[in-house]
Regions:
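Acidic, Ser/Thr/Pro/Gly-enriched interdomain connector segments
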Residues: 2-4, 23-57, 99-127
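Bacterial N-terminal signal peptides
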Residues: 9-20
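A short amphipathic alpha-helical interaction element
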Residues: 34-82, 142-147
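Solvent-exposed, polar/charged alpha-helical surfaces in well-ordered, non-transmembrane soluble domains
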Residues: 42, 46, 64-72, 87, ...
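Sec-exported extracytoplasmic/periplasmic mature domains
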Residues: 49-53, 71-79, 94-98, 143-160, ...
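Extracellular LysM carbohydrate-binding repeats and other cell-envelope/extracellular binding modules
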Residues: 64-110, 153-183
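Secretory/export targeting leaders with adjacent low-complexity proregions
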Residues: 127-209
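Gly/Pro-biased beta-strand-loop elements
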Residues: 175-281, 308, 312
Length: 320
């Protein structure tokens, strides 16, 4: 599988249709389906992730999260969405200067665990586990490389995912460090309608973008202006059935140990509304596509990048 700026430009051209390009050339081309998979889509997702415009879980599919991340990147950089702006977009993304797929050797630490055989759905059963660990090396690597497990299998059809094995992975390492370098006076805005979170710098520029899942009919997002009150890495989850409309009231309150498969993922950012916050999730593939119990859920890696940018007192806006 070879990636080139020419290959990527094919996806950009397709995106022009999806964003309403008016050129006759683009209009005559069929848009890729949300389930289409290919090198152009994968490269675009990797480049957007490296630019801090996340499409959530990298899966190589031209779906909703990818299209909207690309549109947000274009808007933030003053780039039109038509086919004529393709060259400028490719340059802004760094196409051709970074290999989207690189080799990685699975380390002994990657394979050491500890791992859970399975993660029970019931909170009481989860509370009996010493940690909400990954269930496999594959799941751990998927989190490390911001990817769907199915993508890693597709890139490495013969891999056993064991220590010492060399595999092909999305080139996203270092994205967290790049985000951390921008820490400063920022503001978070979450749009319920768009299902996205954006971080703005003091000049009003978007410096981070990611899809989210926020609220539901039963647990609406608390619209308004708030602030971050605490940032907790690897949080212990205090499960209280009284806070959930769909919980069995007979269930007891329990503490669920930390870990990437904890219900709130690897980081919790509380706001000055009781029981509400921004957090990670063990279900990266659902982000942007489902509802939540009122809070703002993100992939674990995106939540980590937001946590690197904020501090107590950071303004947070929840809007419709």
């Amino acid at each position: 599988m070879t990636f080139t700026p020419k290959t990527l430009s094919c996806f950009v051209a397709s995106a022009a249709i999806l964003f309403g390009a008016s050129t006759s050339t683009a209009a005559n081309r069929p848009a890729p389906s949300a389930r289409s998979v290919g090198p152009a889509q994968l490269e675009m997702q990797v480049l957007l992730d490296r630019a801090n415009f996340s499409s959530g879980e990298i899966d190589g599919k031209a779906g909703k999260n990818s299209r909207e991340a690309l549109a947000a990147f274009q808007a933030a950089h003053g780039l039109a969405s038509g086919a004529r702006s393709r060259k400028a977009l490719l340059q802004a993304l760094g196409a051709g200067t970074v290999k989207p797929i690189v080799s990685y050797t699975i380390t002994a630490k990657d394979a050491a665990g500890p791992f859970n055989k399975t993660i029970p759905e019931d909170a009481t059963e989860q509370s009996k586990l010493p940690g909400l660990y990954y269930t496999s090396v594959l799941e751990e690597l998927a989190g490390k490389f911001h990817s769907a497990q199915a993508l890693l299998k597709r890139l490495n059809p013969r891999a056993r995912f064991i220590a010492g094995e060399r595999i092909r992975v999305p080139n996203v390492l270092g994205a967290e460090q790049a985000t951390r370098a921008q820490t400063g006076a920022v503001k978070i805005v979450v749009s319920k309608k768009a299902s996205v979170l954006m971080v703005y710098d003091r000049e009003g520029q978007v410096i981070f973008y990611a899809p989210v899942t926020s609220g539901s009919e039963h647990d609406p997002l608390p619209f308004g202006n708030w602030v971050i009150t605490d940032v907790v890495r690897n949080p212990i989850y205090n499960y209280n059935p009284n806070l959930f409309w769909d919980a069995d009231p007979a269930n007891a309150k329990v503490k669920i140990a930390a870990g990437p498969n904890n219900p709130v993922g690897v980081v919790w950012m509380g706001i000055n509304v009781p029981h509400y916050g921004i957090h990670g999730t063990p279900e990266a593939g659902e982000i942007g596509h489902s509802a939540s119990h009122g809070c703002v859920r993100m992939t674990n890696w995106d939540a980590t990048r937001v946590a690197d940018l904020v501090k107590d007192g950071t303004p947070v806006v929840f809007e419709e």
